[in-house]
Every structure is written in C-alpha cells, then in structure tokens.
Amino acid sequence: SIKSLLNRSKKPDKIFINIPFKYRRFKETIKDDEIPKFDNSIVEITRCEDYGPATKLLGSLDKLEKNSLVILFDDDHVYENYMVEKFSYFYSKAPNNAYSFYVHPLRKFGIGQGADGFAINTNFLNGIKDFYNKVVKDYKELFLYDDLWISYFLYFFKKNKILSLENHLKKDKDGKFSPIYKKHIVASGLVETYGESLIEAVKKRDQIAIE
C-alpha cells in the first residue's frame, strides 16, 4: 500500500504510519526494531496509543497541519495511481466537504469508507480526540468501526458533507466502476465484529449508528 502511494505522479507530502506501543485488541507488542525502515523522507513512523482502527487518524493527529488535506486509507490495500490526484482536485474546489470513493448511505448522513480512501480537511478535526475519549473509547462496537464514528463526528458536530466520488472511478471493460483499490480484501473484520453474515453485519452496524 505504501509503495502504491509513493509510485505516482502526485505524491502525498507526508505519509504517517501509526503503530501503537501496545494493542488493546491483541496480546502482541511491536518493538521498534521490528518495524520496517523506509528509505523515503515522506514516510514517518509514529508510535502511539491504540485507538483501534482510528489509530490511522488519531495516532498522528497532533502532527497534521491546519487547513490541509488528510487522506485515510487501509494499509492492506493497493490503491489506483489517481486516488491522491482526484482527492486533491475536489478538495481544491470545495475544501469544506469530506470525500470518499464509496459513501455508505445511512438515513441523514453518509459514512465515508477508509478502505476506499477518506479525505478530510484537517480544520474539521478539532475536538475529535475528545469525542473519541468521551464517546468511542469504551464502546466496543464504535471502537472497532472508525468509519462510522468519524463520519458521525464530521456530519453532526462539524456540519461537514461527506460526498461520494464513486462516479469518478475508472470503469472496467464491461463499463462498471472499478474500486479505487486494486487488491480486494474480504470484509472479515466487519463480520467478526458484528456477525457471521456480511448483510447482518452491516445491518447491526447501522443499528449502532442510529441508537
């Protein structure tokens, strides 16, 4: 995933890889000498607290510049080479919106998907760590589903629209939109968290969102 982000015409200014000192969900710990070294100044390793899947955002939150674009992505996906360029273009046109290449609809608001890239203006992240500590940290289902609570925070607390860029995906030979990532990962994490059936898992996740 990191290589796919670096191997493109428009590179990110910085890539933060956030690795907790100790995980809440696992017994294993990762020592500094076990972390791969990157021969590129763009990539920076941050050791931090375990915030669940939201570690990818909260782990380096204090290092993010104001009025800039942060893109959340999954480290087990290989992304298309136009992802950063597309996000940057739409951000430049309307920076007060958030964007994802897939937005899951849920009543009044949509849920941006980190797996499909989730682009956010850092100006709207003020207060998100307090929200995590007060609302998310001790609620297992929310702790494990960062896309949901981050989207909730942006929409209801920051009045941020979360817009889908699905119609701007490239199409395959059959004329269907191709995902923004090349490597498809089965959503087993969602199933493990909420149930054996993916449909049931999504329904339970949505029920959590509206409680």
Model-derived segments and spans:
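Conserved donor-nucleotide/metal-binding helix-loop-beta segment in metal-dependent transferases, i.e.
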Residues: 81-105
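C-terminal catalytic/acceptor-binding lobe
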Residues: 1, 127, 136-211
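Active-site-proximal specificity loops/subdomain of glycosyltransferases
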Residues: 16-68
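Conserved nucleotide-sugar donor-binding
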Residues: 111-132
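A short acidic, amphipathic alpha-helical/loop segment
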Residues: 1-4, 59, 85-87
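Short, acidic, metal-binding catalytic loop of nucleotide-sugar glycosyltransferases
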Residues: 1-14, 21-22, 37
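Short beta-strand-to-loop acidic/aromatic patch adjacent to the donor-nucleotide binding site
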Residues: 67-78
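Short beta-strand/turn micro-motifs composed of small residues
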Residues: 19, 100, 166
